[in-house]
């Protein structure tokens, strides 16, 4: 079985299905899993019935609504930081005000940037630093790769033990660290962010290193 797991909480699963179909891959909805989905599952399990201030775009908000979670920017029970591609300054300020009052603080993932053609896009990692510099708070929990909560979500979703799962990715600090943190086999592909020099300098070595994802089937 195959699962495409993405930390990008600004996209819906349907966006990735469309993208992968254009690449010639016959992928079903059940084979896509996002950090936004795992976050919703976590909120429903740990904070059932809670209202949530979602710092994210409309697609992430729709994911929370799909999971039956009430959204509120007026006295929410907890706050969730997502990859907000519709960021507004005063929305960020309201978010900080609730965090400053001690509301539980969840981040969907920790990535510093999101790959883009001309220049990497600022991602949640930068917003975490921004908020910490403003009110001296870090997330109480981060959900996506490389954290264990996402790994537990994958195991629950596919009803598989850790030793039956292999993590394939191109980032050492999210993808490969995700495998290590959750007891999965790790496969690094060199077609993205990571170079052989970066692997040599890392204290965590992947189980397998391949030039491209397609080499998995050779």
Give each language-model segment a name.
Residues 3, 9-33, 37-218:
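Asp-based, Mg2+/Mn2+-dependent phosphohydrolase catalytic module
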